Amino acid sequence: MGYYYWDPTYILVVIGAVICMIASARVKGTFNKYSQLRSMSGMNGAQVAQRVLQAAGIYDVQVRHVSGSLTDHYDPRTKTVNLSDPVYNATSVAALGVAAHECGHAIQHAKSYAPLSIRSALVPIANFGSMLAWPVILIGLLFNTRSSGLIIDIGILLFSAAVLFQLVTLPVEFDASRRALVMLRTQGILADDELRYTRRVLKSAALTYVASAAAAILRLLRIILITNGRRRDD
């Protein structure tokens, strides 16, 4: 008979995964629901993006179409607002909200919004940390030497950089949504009742980032529990 070992800290990973799944399902459901509601302005996502950028005095950012669903993003390296299939040509209140949100990031970039600058600086560090954290920690756990504790701490620090990136992302996303709603209202693109629906779409999207941050914190907590348990055993 095989021997099976259950690590109780796995529950933290499971909780994080469930939170992310619920948030993802909610944003998809909310977007699909309000994708059926056409805006009274009749403008599509690309037109709204151009309108918002011009209203913000930004003329060096291009609006592009990208394939996929909900793959919308702003790329500060190429200064492009990239809108996906359900947004670029769509006229729904959901699509216009997403388009304006991505323009919110372009406005942040143009105004040197501090949290966005910090997040951009953290990207290579977070990628490096998330890739090497576990290998470094495993080396520290497997090789019982005087420097094992230091190696483990380095691994935890590397993973903490990835967690920090997730946390810094939160104010960036919330602020982009705030800027989007202000632009949609002041430019007369959406009526007040339409803004209420768009706010729901953007709020559900923001919750996915909250879920990702929570999951990252839970994974970090698991790492700390595992390594502390090993240290006590030693």
Feature annotation, model-predicted:
Residues 2-7, 24-129, 164-234:
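Polar-ligand-bearing catalytic/cofactor-coordination segments
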Residues 5-13, 147-157:
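Hydrophobic alpha-helical transmembrane segments
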Residues 10-26:
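N-terminal, Lys/Arg- and Ser/Thr-rich interaction peptides
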Residues 123-148:
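Post-HExxH zinc-binding segment in Zn-dependent metallohydrolases
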